[in-house]
Regions:
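Helix-start (N-cap) detector for alpha-helical repeat units in TPR-like alpha-solenoids
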Residues: 1, 34-35, 67-68, 101-102
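Alpha-helical segment of the N-proximal tetratricopeptide repeat
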Residues: 1-29, 33
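Register position in tetratricopeptide repeats
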Residues: 12-13, 46, 79, 109-116
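Short coil turns that delineate tetratricopeptide repeat
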Residues: 31, 64-65, 98
């Protein structure tokens, strides 16, 4: 059985709990490991469980440096009110693709918040 593909099917039907279980099996088998870690993290993000998503995103980044991995890590930190770590990850994502408008917007929002807080 291709756990990764079946997990994607569950993800696409918004059954995130079942998707997580199958992505974890895929990770154990080292099948599409970086993508499986990332997709598991995204399921946790969809479930608003940011604390569980963070270590998965960090592990996926050890395997593959990808803009969306850094961006979602930044998003998790924003949702947990850790603007400093969020900014670091958004800036890292932006260095990988300076044309990314979402990264630029996220960075601007955080920097503007810092400016307002320091007035």
């Amino acid at each position: 059985m291709n756990y990764f593909q079946k997990a994607n099917d569950y993800y696409n039907s918004k059954d995130y709990h079942k998707a997580i279980a199958l992505y974890k099996k895929s990770i154990t088998l080292k099948t599409n490991e970086a993508a499986s870690l990332y997709n598991t993290a995204v399921c946790f993000i969809k479930l608003k469980n940011y604390k569980d998503a963070i270590p998965l995103l960090e592990k996926s980044l050890l395997l593959k440096k990808d803009i969306k991995y850094f961006f979602n890590l930044g998003y998790c930190y924003i949702m947990l009110d850790n603007n400093k770590k969020a900014l670091i990850n958004f800036k890292t994502a932006w260095t990988l693709n300076p044309e990314d408008k979402d990264c630029k917007k996220a960075i601007s929002l955080i920097e503007n918040k810092y400016k307002k807080d320091n007035l």
